[in-house]
Protein backbone atom coordinates (compact mmCIF):
# COMPACT_ATOMS: atom_id res chain seq x y z
CA UNK A 1 0.00 0.00 0.00
CA UNK A 2 1.21 3.52 -0.81
CA UNK A 3 0.40 6.78 0.94
CA UNK A 4 0.26 9.92 -1.21
CA UNK A 5 0.68 13.10 0.83
CA UNK A 6 -0.40 16.55 -0.33
CA UNK A 7 -0.22 19.73 1.76
CA UNK A 8 -1.93 23.08 1.40
CA UNK A 9 -2.68 26.19 3.46
CA UNK A 10 -5.76 28.42 3.50
CA UNK A 11 -6.81 31.40 5.57
CA UNK A 12 -8.57 30.27 8.75
CA UNK A 13 -11.87 31.84 7.64
CA UNK A 14 -11.81 29.72 4.45
CA UNK A 15 -11.41 26.37 6.24
CA UNK A 16 -15.01 25.13 6.05
CA UNK A 17 -15.55 26.33 2.48
CA UNK A 18 -12.29 24.76 1.29
CA UNK A 19 -13.10 21.46 3.00
CA UNK A 20 -16.47 21.41 1.22
CA UNK A 21 -14.68 22.19 -2.06
CA UNK A 22 -12.19 19.35 -1.43
CA UNK A 23 -15.06 16.93 -0.86
CA UNK A 24 -16.67 17.97 -4.16
CA UNK A 25 -13.45 17.78 -6.21
CA UNK A 26 -10.29 15.94 -5.17
CA UNK A 27 -11.78 13.63 -2.55
CA UNK A 28 -14.62 12.70 -4.89
CA UNK A 29 -12.13 11.95 -7.69
CA UNK A 30 -9.90 9.94 -5.34
CA UNK A 31 -12.85 7.76 -4.34
CA UNK A 32 -13.86 7.20 -7.97
CA UNK A 33 -10.35 6.09 -9.00
CA UNK A 34 -9.58 2.36 -9.15
CA UNK A 35 -7.19 1.35 -6.40
CA UNK A 36 -7.97 4.17 -3.97
CA UNK A 37 -8.31 2.70 -0.48
CA UNK A 38 -9.50 5.86 1.28
CA UNK A 39 -8.30 9.29 2.31
CA UNK A 40 -7.59 11.06 5.58
CA UNK A 41 -7.89 14.85 5.75
CA UNK A 42 -5.90 16.36 8.61
CA UNK A 43 -6.05 20.03 9.59
CA UNK A 44 -4.33 22.25 12.10
CA UNK A 45 -4.62 25.93 12.93
CA UNK A 46 -1.37 27.87 12.70
CA UNK A 47 -1.74 31.55 13.41
CA UNK A 48 -4.47 32.89 11.15
CA UNK A 49 -4.21 29.99 8.71
CA UNK A 50 -5.31 26.37 8.40
CA UNK A 51 -2.87 23.74 7.20
CA UNK A 52 -4.36 20.79 5.32
CA UNK A 53 -2.62 17.45 4.94
CA UNK A 54 -4.29 14.86 2.72
CA UNK A 55 -3.14 11.28 3.05
CA UNK A 56 -4.66 9.17 0.30
CA UNK A 57 -4.08 5.42 0.37
CA UNK A 58 -3.51 3.43 -2.82
CA UNK A 59 -2.89 -0.19 -3.79
CA UNK A 60 -0.07 0.66 -6.23
CA UNK A 61 1.76 3.38 -8.13
CA UNK A 62 -0.12 2.29 -11.25
CA UNK A 63 -3.38 3.10 -9.44
CA UNK A 64 -2.00 6.52 -8.48
CA UNK A 65 -1.23 7.10 -12.17
CA UNK A 66 -4.94 6.56 -12.81
CA UNK A 67 -5.57 9.63 -10.68
CA UNK A 68 -2.49 11.81 -11.21
CA UNK A 69 -1.22 10.80 -14.64
CA UNK A 70 2.28 9.60 -15.51
CA UNK A 71 4.04 12.30 -13.46
CA UNK A 72 2.80 11.02 -10.10
CA UNK A 73 5.00 13.42 -8.12
CA UNK A 74 3.09 16.43 -9.51
CA UNK A 75 0.27 17.78 -7.36
CA UNK A 76 -3.21 17.73 -8.91
CA UNK A 77 -5.10 21.03 -8.62
CA UNK A 78 -8.64 22.06 -9.51
CA UNK A 79 -9.82 25.41 -10.94
CA UNK A 80 -10.89 27.13 -7.70
CA UNK A 81 -7.90 25.93 -5.64
CA UNK A 82 -6.15 29.22 -6.45
CA UNK A 83 -9.02 31.11 -4.77
CA UNK A 84 -8.39 29.32 -1.46
CA UNK A 85 -4.76 28.22 -1.27
CA UNK A 86 -2.04 30.62 -0.17
CA UNK A 87 0.57 28.65 -2.13
CA UNK A 88 0.28 26.02 -4.86
CA UNK A 89 3.02 23.54 -3.92
CA UNK A 90 3.90 21.73 -7.17
CA UNK A 91 4.74 18.30 -5.75
CA UNK A 92 3.46 15.58 -3.44
CA UNK A 93 5.24 12.81 -1.52
CA UNK A 94 4.72 9.06 -1.68
CA UNK A 95 5.49 6.56 1.08
CA UNK A 96 5.20 2.80 1.32
CA UNK A 97 2.86 1.94 4.21
CA UNK A 98 4.93 -0.30 6.49
CA UNK A 99 2.30 -0.76 9.23
CA UNK A 100 -1.42 0.02 9.10
CA UNK A 101 -4.41 -0.67 11.35
CA UNK A 102 -5.18 -4.36 11.31
CA UNK A 103 -1.71 -5.32 10.04
CA UNK A 104 0.39 -5.16 13.21
CA UNK A 105 0.28 -8.95 13.48
Show which residues each predicted segment covers.
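Glycine-rich beta-strand-turn "strand-cap" elements at beta-sheet edges
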Residues: 2, 40-50, 77-105
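Residues at secondary-structure transition points
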Residues: 12-14, 32, 41-44
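Residue-level signal for secondary-structure boundary sites
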Residues: 14-16, 62-64, 100-102
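An amphipathic, aromatic/His-enriched active-site/gating alpha helix that lines ligand/cofactor pockets
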Residues: 21-37, 57-93
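Short, well-ordered beta-strand segments in beta-rich or mixed alpha/beta enzyme
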Residues: 3-8, 40-70
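Short, surface-exposed ligand-recognition loops at beta-strand->loop->(often short) alpha-helix junctions
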Residues: 9-22
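Short alpha-helical segments used as structural interaction elements across diverse proteins
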Residues: 1-4, 20
Amino acid sequence: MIGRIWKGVTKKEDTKRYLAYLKATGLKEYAATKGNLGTYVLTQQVGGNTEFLLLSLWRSMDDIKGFAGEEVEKAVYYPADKEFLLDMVPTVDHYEIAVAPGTQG
